[in-house]
Regions:
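Helix-loop-helix junctions that connect adjacent transmembrane segments
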Residues: 13-18, 57, 133-140, 168-296, ...
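Hydrophobic transmembrane alpha-helices that form the core helical bundles
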Residues: 43-50, 58-59, 68-149, 154-157, ...
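TM-loop-TM module centered on a large, flexible mid-protein loop between adjacent transmembrane helices
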Residues: 89-90, 96, 128-133, 244-314, ...
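Transmembrane helix-loop boundary segments of multi-pass membrane transporters
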Residues: 46-57, 129-141, 160-171, 297, ...
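A generic transmembrane alpha-helix motif of multi-pass inner-membrane proteins
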Residues: 372-385, 408-483
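Select transmembrane alpha-helical segments in multipass membrane proteins
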Residues: 21-31, 57, 65, 96-110, ...
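Membrane-interface "cap" regions at the ends of multi-pass membrane proteins
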Residues: 1-55, 61, 68, 72, ...
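Membrane-interface loop-to-helix entry segments
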Residues: 140-191, 222, 244-251, 381-384, ...
Length: 483
């Protein structure tokens, strides 16, 4: 069937996954856990303070607001095109299948290696040195990685219901601990005492470059996108997936603003300028000061965060591969499910293999370099994926979805979100341009991803293997409606 022959009424498919297994709390936690609340603070707080200073909570607020616009755009597609393919299907259906293929490739590079890379980065930079310094016990970082991955893989094979319950538990624990630490900071303020200064917009002029603080805060929110591939296992996906997309960003925006305010006050508003040059992670130093021996709960929160994000990315990555295998653009074996557990076992097998590859890369090239290179490559790719989805929103609602067309939602918001994405990439990678280090290598990896994607599309075109283009647009049809 040619793509042009696919009528909207024909574009549905039944699922082999377990329908109605995940409620709204699970959908929200899928996005929240992939953002990784405590790990995101580890990866972004010090860097953003170096640009935004006391106005760091505002940087997270503005960055979150911009991503709310993008999440709102994605929700416009999710509510009409529910599918385990997520962005792959949305873009294929609303814009073009070849554009959707890029989203599928990006998800294949983004979500599958998260477990090995996140656990490696956390264990190498925090867990091993902290446990050794605090207790004199030398637990090698790679032991944490292997143990963590074993747990994540176990949950993946057990089925979506159990893994989502584990996700809710681990994700909730980390948020409670991080918020408790922030409250402690507000109650037991550091030098400068309790202060509203971090929330005062009158202090914007004190930031060295608040704009760059906003730009880099956007990186902390990446992960909400993984809610999309859970559609076929969600209750009422046309409602819950859009809420999960937008809701996870809003919840984390409030979280980031509150906890960074608490940490700045706890560390000391008069010492905020020393945060970027601290030899140890300032949040950990602060936790040791106010919680004494109980500061180990911070390590527990970080470990929970790494486990939760790994589970969430396992789920999102395998479901995307399942949909791509079902459409035939990837080996059809990936579209098969276990008849008992309703899990895409072959996709899970492949995901386990990706952990091995990612871990091997870490051992060869080093934890920090591999993690930062990968993170930068994915960031550029996500912005391009956003823009493709935004084009799809405009195209769909000006044509097939004309009856629901809204100039604000379907033109203004997509244009603003796309423009913001372009500015983020420009300021992050080209102004100024760097020709060395992980940022540069991340740019090269992104270019390689695009080249491989184009070559694959050309190859399939030459070979006449284009049946997948129609199947890529198939939208999930529920066997029954669950509210």
């Amino acid at each position: 069937m040619a793509v042009e022959d696919l009528k909207p009424s024909q574009g549905t498919v039944k699922t082999g996954l377990r329908e109605n297994a995940v409620g709204l709390p699970g959908m929200l936690m899928q996005g929240i856990a992939t953002i990784a609340p405590s790990f995101a603070i580890l990866a972004s707080f010090v860097f953003i303070v170096s640009w935004a200073g006391l106005s760091t909570p505002w940087a997270y607020l503005f960055g979150g607001a911009l991503l709310c616009l993008q999440a709102l755009n994605a929700a416009q597609l999710a509510k009409v095109f529910p599918s385990a393919g997520g962005w792959y299907t949305w873009i294929a259906r609303a814009f073009h299948p070849r554009a959707g293929f890029f989203a599928g490739v990006l998800f294949s590079v983004w979500l599958p290696p998260v477990g090995a890379l996140t656990l490696s980065y956390l264990a190498y930079t925090v867990l091993e040195p902290s446990i050794k310094a605090e207790y004199g016990v030398d637990v090698k970082w790679w032991i944490w990685v292997i143990a963590g991955l074993a747990l994540v893989i176990f949950f993946a094979y057990q089925g979506i219901a159990l893994s989502e319950k584990a996700l809710i538990i681990t994700g909730s624990i980390e948020i409670v601990i991080m918020v408790a630490l922030a409250i402690t900071g507000l109650v037991s303020a550091g030098p400068g005492g309790f202060s509203w200064a971090p929330l005062n917009p009158g202090n914007f002029h004190l930031a060295s470059n608040l704009f760059l603080g906003v730009v880099f805060s956007i990186f902390a929110f990446s992960g909400w996108e993984s809610t999309g591939p859970m559609a076929e296992e969600s209750k009422n996906p046309k409602r819950n997936v859009p809420i999960g997309l937008v809701g996870s960003v809003i919840i984390l925006m409030v979280y980031f603003v509150f906890v960074t305010w608490g940490y700045l006050v706890g560390i000391g508003v008069s010492k905020a300028g020393t945060i970027p040059t601290a030899t140890a992670w300032p949040v950990a130093t602060f936790a040791q000061h106010v919680w004494s021996g109980a500061w180990v709960f911070l390590l527990f929160a970080l470990l929970n965060s790494a486990i939760a994000v790994s589970i969430a990315c396992f789920n999102g990555g395998t479901r995307t591969w399942y949909a791509m295998g079902r459409s035939g653009v990837l080996p059809t074996a990936l579209g098969k499910v276990n008849p008992k557990r309703k899990t895409p076992d072959n996709s899970i097998h492949l995901e386990v293999g990706m952990q091995v590859v990612a871990f091997a890369c870490v051992l060869i090239w080093g934890v920090s370099d591999v993690f930062i290179t990968w993170a930068n490559a994915i960031t550029i790719g996500l912005v391009l994926m956003y823009i493709l989805a935004n084009i799809g929103v405009v195209k769909y609602y000006l044509t097939e979805g004309r009856a629901q067309f809204s100039p604000l939602l379907h033109v203004v918001v997509p244009v603003i979100a796309s423009a913001a994405g372009v500015v983020v990439v420009w300021k992050s990678y080209f102004s100024p341009f760097t020709s060395s280090g992980p940022v540069f290598w991340g740019l090269l990896v992104f270019i390689a991803i695009v080249v491989v994607t184009i070559l694959a599309l050309i190859y399939m075109r030459i070979r006449g293997q284009e049946e997948w283009m129609a199947k890529a647009q198939l939208v999930f049809e529920q066997s029954g409606t669950s509210h």
